[in-house]
Amino acid sequence: MSALPATIRPAVPGDETALLGLIRELAVYEKLEHVLVATEDDLTRAFFAEGAPAGALLAETESGEAVGYAIWFGNFSSFLARPGVYLEDVYVRPSHRGTGTGKRLLQAVARIALERDAGRMEWVVLDWNVGAIDFYRSIGGEILDEWRLVRMGEDAIEKFAAG
């Protein structure tokens, strides 16, 4: 029997355990569990504190099991002179892939982008994740091969800022 589609809702305080479990699953899937240091307290601050910098959505079954999530935050395009939305994570458990849950998570983030008058929604995808790349293209996403992600970790930020 195939899994039923999940309901999408904003994450609320008390969802930290479920969110962290799903984040851990994504880290394992992406072979990045060695860099995962987030805690439930970190998620509380990130999503639910006053002035929280990010938002989260949960996909739940009728029984309340969390089977997917999306994390987003606002950014800005100087070229458009408009806000944007950056999708940090989108993940659906393998048992619920193919049910439309991932698409509905992305649609929910797209609605948030519209509410914020965003000129664009952006995210990255690992180059080996061909299934995700094909899916993103099928929903209108454009893979920008000419751009490369640049990352500066906390230690590098401190060193660079110090001069």
Predicted regions mapped to residue ranges:
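A short beta-loop-alpha structural element at the N-terminal edge
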Residues: 7-19
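Conserved GNAT-fold acetyl-CoA-binding loop/helix
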Residues: 20-46
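A short helix-loop-beta-strand connector motif used in the catalytic cores of GNAT acetyltransferases and
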Residues: 45-58, 86
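Conserved beta-hairpin
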Residues: 54-68
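A conserved beta-strand-loop-helix scaffold within acyl/acetyltransferase catalytic domains
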Residues: 72-79
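Conserved acetyl-CoA pyrophosphate-binding loop and the N-cap/start of the following alpha-helix
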Residues: 96, 100-108
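Conserved GNAT acetyl-CoA-binding A-motif
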Residues: 114-124
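Conserved beta-strand-loop-alpha-helix junction that forms the acyl-donor binding cleft
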Residues: 123-132, 151-154
